[in-house]
Amino acid sequence: MAFAPSVAHKPVAAAVCPVMAATEALATEGGLEARGAIFTRSEVVDFILDLAGYTEDQPLHEKRLLEPSFGGGDFLLPIIQRLLSAWRAARPNGTEVDDLGDAIRAVELHHDTFRSTYAAVVALLKREGLSANAATALADRWLSQGDFLLAPLEGQFDFVVGNPPYVRPELIPAPLLAEYRSRYQTMYDRADIYIPFIERSLTALSAGGNLGFICADRWMKNRYGGPLRSLVAERFHLKVYVDMVDTPAFHSDVIAYPAITIISREGGGATRIAHRPSIDRATLTTLAGLLSAPTLPKDAGPVRELARVTNGAEPWLLESSDQMALIRRLEGAFPLLEEAGCKVGIGVATGADKAFIGDFESLDVEPDRKLPLVTTKDIMTGEVQWRGQGVINPFAESGGLVDLGEYPRLRRYLEARRDVIAGRHCAKKAPANWYRTIDRITPALAARPKLLIPDIKGESHIVFEGGELYPSHNLYYVTSDDWDLRALQAVLLSAVSRLFVATYSTKMRGGFLRFQAQYLRRIRIPRWADVPEPLRRELAEAAIKRDVQACNRAVFRLYGLSHEERSALGGNGE
């Protein structure tokens, strides 16, 4: 979906006094639940600042940082310490107020909290050697009391960091909720207040700027997060995701599914992910280095990389703990793909494609010595559009190589390319069999209906082939004597199958998944005999239409997924 320019900056008109009254009530009376106040451990704060790039080796006094809900100063005070350290290292010539006055913009709604943290900021600055006048002047420049979602913001920011408030919509006064909905397109369905906080923070980033938040991860999968996921996919790069479930990230256990995200205002790319790190400084410092490294080392330990996590409003599959629980349940309940009557294989490797593969009609060999070949280029659209390639078949039906004396056209063809063909490693090992392809070719495979799957893809790409073409070496295929292939195609196109592959697959550079046979074989499916006839039809029809959402709905029923399990894979538990 396209996003209109933010209307966050429009002033609250005097006529909208119910909005101002509701805001003032929250600022004055709101308890912790109403304000969504949650306190973050210092080790986690430093981890997020490191991930966002707000580090003392940078000229932080020349950068701008926004903290949209500073609370008791869990983030703000360490930010100030880093800023002062970087500023002193730069050997500045100006005054503290001139050099540092624009470096921080921090907002807090609650009056008492604002006053308390304001005093803590002034005290910190004085301990750091600033005069009382300079400390007060900086605190006045940096801190403001108000509603971040309504307050004016000047300019853009290199960093936005923090822990946005977590407030359910039913706790927000109706006039204020209506005002938020009018300003923020992501305030959709039952979105919590942290959703528009993320929207406004993202749109406040300068080019190349980083947002680093810790908050609930529900928006990454569920219904109300769809518009925010679209915004991120359209304009930003989800750089880092760290699953913090079951870690003591906060001083109280108040968010069920916390996660750290680093989102940058730059073109999209791969996402680095880590799960449930130990909350100690040494571990988190090492992990931040891996997650931020220009190139991920081969032995990246707990860090993995995924391509195309963001895709419009589609849910983000990030191997979170609830998804792992789903994997484990399905593994206990259903047989492996090949135990359920399916076979996974790979297309033919020749060792010399330029010699063995060419235009089918132009391959000057006997008709039974060539087969029409399907390649990744033929299936890019999701349907087979054969481009006319063919492959030479030197194998007899009995399994050995044919006698070239019985196939003069084949012999001439191969002899004309003998240097290339005989120069292959497999030919040198067995010179008498110099003209064999690396893999044996079985013509009956071409005649079998099959599902074709490219090796490396960012998402499931499963294409039905009706039984006319032989697969090339960069295509995996699935056949079955039991399952209807269209119904099976729906299963393999679904979020369930993608989760299996994402869980077990190694990742290529850039985070692309490898849909290799060994990972496809990890997929669990019911036996065909156990699938009711109406569901069989629903699966097949969804696949024929290539309607992935319809595939998901049918597949969720096939596996008997609970509301929570469906939510883990996307949607709102439907």
From Swiss-Prot:
Family: Belongs to the N(4)/N(6)-methyltransferase family.
Organism: Pseudomonas aeruginosa
One MF term in the entry's GO annotations: site-specific DNA-methyltransferase (adenine-specific) activity
Protein name, entry field: Type II methyltransferase M.PaeR7I
A matching Pfam family: Eco57I
Top class in the EC scheme: transferase
Highest taxon in the source lineage: Bacteria
Keywords recorded for this protein, A-Z: DNA-binding, Methyltransferase, Plasmid, Restriction system, S-adenosyl-L-methionine, Transferase
E.C. code: 2.1.1.72
Subunit structure: Monomer.
GO terms under biological process: DNA restriction-modification system; methylation
Entry keyword Hydrolase: no
Cited Gene3D superfamilies: Vaccinia Virus protein VP39 (3.40.50.150)
Catalytic activity: a 2'-deoxyadenosine in DNA + S-adenosyl-L-methionine = an N(6)-methyl-2'-deoxyadenosine in DNA + S-adenosyl-L-homocysteine + H(+)
